[in-house]
């Protein structure tokens, strides 16, 4: 499982012209793009949620848990793109939707159980993501 985390001053996700998830933190929040591979499980989702919640990448070396920063979670199978051969990425390392969707949901729910305010995109939908990356700060978490 991979989570590409961006520190943001605002972010939103739109599906079919409708905003389905948005954060407008004061002053910062996190955008988490989540990719799932074949051997991932609920335990990995829980551990990554805990790591993200405590990750000290906000101002003054604080974490989202320290300042109740909101998190926007968006599924992102392209985090498992393989570009070793040719010019067209392979998505073979990405788990199929039937495996990935429940694990993205588990990741999201684990964050909520930890106390996070979480907004989400729509799994499998074509999404337009708008964000203002603060810093910029972008970190890849992987288990």
Swiss-Prot record:
Motif Gly-cisPro motif, important for rejection of L-amino acids mapped to chain: 135-136
One GO MF term: tRNA binding
Keywords: Cytoplasm, Hydrolase, RNA-binding, tRNA-binding
Top-level division of the source organism's lineage: Bacteria
GO BP terms, alphabetized: D-amino acid catabolic process
SUPFAM superfamilies, per the entry: DTD-like
Signal peptide (residue range): none
Catalytic activity: glycyl-tRNA(Ala) + H2O = tRNA(Ala) + glycine + H(+); a D-aminoacyl-tRNA + H2O = a tRNA + a D-alpha-amino acid + H(+)
Top-rank EC class of the record's enzyme: hydrolase
EC number: 3.1.1.96
Subcellular location field: Cytoplasm
Any single GO CC term annotated in Swiss-Prot or TrEMBL for this entry: cytoplasm
Entry-linked Gene3D superfamilies: D-tyrosyl-tRNA(Tyr) deacylase
Pfam families recorded: Tyr_Deacylase (PF02580)
Listed PANTHER family: D-AMINOACYL-TRNA DEACYLASE 1, D-TYROSYL-TRNA TYR DEACYLASE
NCBIfam families (alphabetical): D-aminoacyl-tRNA deacylase (TIGR00256)
Free-text note regarding domains: A Gly-cisPro motif from one monomer fits into the active site of the other monomer to allow specific chiral rejection of L-amino acids.
Protein task: An aminoacyl-tRNA editing enzyme that deacylates mischarged D-aminoacyl-tRNAs. Also deacylates mischarged glycyl-tRNA(Ala), protecting cells against glycine mischarging by AlaRS. Acts via tRNA-based rather than protein-based catalysis; rejects L-amino acids rather than detecting D-amino acids in the active site. By recycling D-aminoacyl-tRNA to D-amino acids and free tRNA molecules, this enzyme counteracts the toxicity associated with the formation of D-aminoacyl-tRNA entities in vivo and helps enforce protein L-homochirality.
UniProt record similarity statement: Belongs to the DTD family.
Assembly, per entry: Homodimer.
Record-given protein name: D-aminoacyl-tRNA deacylase
Source taxonomy: Bacteria, Bacillati, Actinomycetota, Actinomycetes, Mycobacteriales
């Amino acid at each position: 499982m991979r989570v590409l985390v961006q520190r943001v001053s605002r972010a939103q996700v739109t599906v079919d012209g409708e905003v389905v998830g948005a954060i407008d933190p004061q002053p910062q929040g996190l955008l988490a793009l989540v990719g799932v591979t074949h051997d991932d499980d609920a335990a990995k989702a829980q551990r990554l949620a805990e790591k993200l919640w405590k990750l000290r990448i906000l101002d003054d070396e604080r974490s989202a848990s320290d300042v109740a920063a909101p998190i926007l979670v968006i599924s992102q199978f392209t985090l498992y793109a393989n570009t070793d051969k040719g010019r067209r990425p392979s998505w073979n390392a990405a788990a199929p939707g039937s495996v990935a969707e429940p694990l993205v949901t588990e990741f999201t729910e684990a964050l909520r159980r930890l106390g996070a305010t979480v907004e989400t995109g729509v799994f499998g939908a074509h999404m337009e993501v708008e964000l203002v990356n603060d810093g910029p700060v972008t970190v890849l978490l992987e288990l």
